[in-house]
Amino acid sequence: MTTAVIKDHASQKRRNFISKFLIYFFLIVITACMLLPFLWMLSSSFKLNKDVFGFPIQWIPQNPRWQNYVDIWTQIPLLTFVKNTVKITVVVTLLQLFTSSFAAYAFAKMQFKGKNVLFLGYIATIAVPWQAYMVPQFMMMSSWHLNNTHLAIMCLQAFSAFGVFLMKQFYEGVPSELCEAARIDGLSEYGIWWHIMLPLSLPALSTLTIFTFVNTWNDFLGPLIYLT
């Protein structure tokens, strides 16, 4: 009996080891496939232009060209590009955090006529592709004489339907009794939002910060249209 139990235990350990090995092997392969483009990019940064798309791929350049990392700072105003990107990204992120959390509080904790219809209409704009209204936006910015200014991008990206939806879902999980108690104590709606809802919503704000920061930083078509 004892021998059978020991054999079953050993067999179970062997099966667990094999299953874990296969899982980790699969994950390592997937990770390697995801890292390949970054490795190719790093390798290409040390090559001449004519060697970048050579075939077969030379992963380790025979004559690494370190001068490329000097030229990128001297031949184009890269530092200016980075400063502008950081400026726009930080401002847009802060604006979206403010507008999204503020609007979400109204939709989640306040009662007013047509609230649900207005919320659904606003969220429905997520389904409209940006390409459908980028030309009207460009014309609007032109009429306001904001083209070729950072303010154009900041104004257009200061509001986010996704951000409002995300924050509203979080605020609905906060007990309404907290807001009612604050109102009884004489706190205004602005005070409730600032002193109660914002401190409680740091996890949701952190998530929205990451999404907004990455999307704004990676935006290429917007600056190409409004800043050139």
List the predicted regions and their residue ranges:
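A structural signal for multi-pass alpha-helical bundles of membrane permease subunits
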Residues: 4-5, 11-15, 19-228
